[in-house]
Amino acid sequence: MGIVGVGIDLVSIPDFAEQVDQPGTAFAATFTPGERRDASDKSSSAARHLAARWAAKEAVIKAWSGSRFAQRPVLPEDIHRDIEVVTDMWGRPRVRLTGEIAKHLADVTIHVSLTHEGDTAAAVAILETS
């Protein structure tokens, strides 16, 4: 069938860094233990690393929402926690889904690209069916 959704998101790293570890913010319970561990293992700023992952999660949600054009969005509560950005041994990102979103996107391949430039992190997600 081909591409069914495309999403992109940009994140201000300084703004994100101010909020990421604050109790009660949207970011407090958003990242998996693996994502937080990977961020703390990086030589650069953990906030910079997590900002790109937040952008990836948002890009996946936007791609999924776009794939449901003219249909009611079905966004589970705590959806960000069910979208995990993992990397292979060479640092290439991949999205791992769990929970309700994994059921909805079971037959979809998700391609994701992350980048940082200056004070901005960005991600693009493409949803593809075979």
Curated annotation (Swiss-Prot):
Single GO BP term: fatty acid biosynthetic process
Q: Name one Pfam family in it.
A: ACPS
Q: Which GO terms describe its cellular component?
A: cytoplasm
Which cofactors go with this protein?
Answer: Mg(2+)
Query: GO molecular function terms here?
Result: holo-[acyl-carrier-protein] synthase activity; magnesium ion binding
**Cited InterPro entries:** 4-PPantetheinyl_Trfase_dom (IPR008278), 4-PPantetheinyl_Trfase_dom_sf (IPR037143), ACPS (IPR002582), Ppantetheine-prot_Trfase_dom (IPR004568)
Q: Where in the cell is it found?
A: Cytoplasm
Which residues take part in binding Mg(2+)? Answer: 9, 58
* Catalyzed reaction equations: apo-[ACP] + CoA = holo-[ACP] + adenosine 3',5'-bisphosphate + H(+)
What keywords is this UniProt entry annotated with? Cytoplasm, Fatty acid biosynthesis, Fatty acid metabolism, Lipid biosynthesis, Lipid metabolism, Magnesium, Metal-binding, Transferase
- Source organism, top-level taxon: Bacteria
Q: Does the keyword ATP-binding apply?
A: no
Q: Does the keyword Transferase apply?
A: yes
Q: What is its EC number?
A: 2.7.8.7
Group of enzyme by EC: transferase
What is this protein for, i.e. what is its function? Transfers the 4'-phosphopantetheine moiety from coenzyme A to a Ser of acyl-carrier-protein.
The family line of this record is: Belongs to the P-Pant transferase superfamily. AcpS family.
Query: What is this protein identified as?
Result: Holo-[acyl-carrier-protein] synthase
Identify the taxonomic lineage of the organism of origin.
Bacteria, Bacillati, Actinomycetota, Actinomycetes, Mycobacteriales
